[in-house]
Amino acid sequence: MADLEGKVTVVTGAASGIGRAVAERLAAEGMHVVGVDIRSDGPVTVEADLTTREGNKRAVDAALEAHGRIDVVVPNAGVQHVSPVADFPEDRWDQLTSLLLTSPFLLAKYAWPSLVESGGRYVAIASVHGVVASPFKSAYISAKHGLLGLVKVLALEGAPDGVTATAVCPGYVRTPLVENQIADQAKAHGMDEDRVLEDVILAPHAVKRLVEPAEVADAVVWLLGPAGRTMTGTPLVMDQGWSAR
C-alpha cells in the first residue's frame, strides 16, 4: 500500500476523465491535491491555461503557497486533433505540443527544487501513442513520444536526489476525449457508435474494451507506493495488448 497521507500533488487536467479520477483517488489516499484545469469543475482548485508559461507557473506557485511543498507532479492535461499532415493546422500543432509536451516540462522545471527536497515523484500520463503510431495524429504522437524522452531525462537528473520519473501509457480510455472521437468516427464512417468502438477504436487492442479512468488511477497509486521505487525512466504500458502486435 502507498503511504501518501499528507503529501502534496499537482494533477493537471483534473476537471474530467483520467485527471479527475487520479485527483479523486489521490485525495482518497490522504494527499493534498492541487487540481489544475482551464475550467473549474470537480477537484479543480486552480484555473490555469497550461499552454502558457504563466499558467504552468501559477499551478506550481499555488501548490507551494497553499502547502509549502510538492511531493508529486502528475501532468495529465490533454487535447486531440485528427488531420493528415498536409492539412494539419499549424496553430493546432502549437496548441497540442504546448499542452502535451511543453507543459509537462515547465511543471517539472518549476516544481524541481521542491521535488528534490522531498525526494518526490513525477508520474506523467502519456499514452500508448508514446510507443506506437497511428495516422492523422502527428502532433499528439510526436508530443507523447517526446514526453517519454523527457521522463528519461528527469529520471537521470533526479536519481542522485531520490526523485523518480515515470509515465503511464494507457490504450484508449473511457474519457470525454475518446467518446467524442467515437461520435466523430461514427459520422465519418456512417456506422453506429457501438460498431465504431469495436471495429475502429478497439481494433488495435487485443483485449476488446476501453481502459477505465479508475484503472489508470490505480496504476498511478502503485507507482507512488513502495513497489514504484524501482520504476524510473521507463513507462508503465497498460494498452490491452496493443503494443504486442
Locate predicted features:
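Short C-terminal tail/terminal secondary-structure segment
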Residues: 5, 132, 220, 232-245
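Short, small/polar-rich loop/turn modules that mediate ligand/substrate recognition or access, typified
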Residues: 74, 159, 164, 231-233
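Substrate-binding pocket helix/loop in short-chain dehydrogenase/reductase
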Residues: 84-85, 92-97, 201
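Active-site helix of classical SDR
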Residues: 108, 143, 151
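Alpha-helical segment proximal to the catalytic Tyr-Lys
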Residues: 113, 156-157
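Residue(s) in the substrate-gating loop at a strand-loop-helix junction
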Residues: 127
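C-terminal helical subdomain
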Residues: 167, 175, 191-231, 238-240
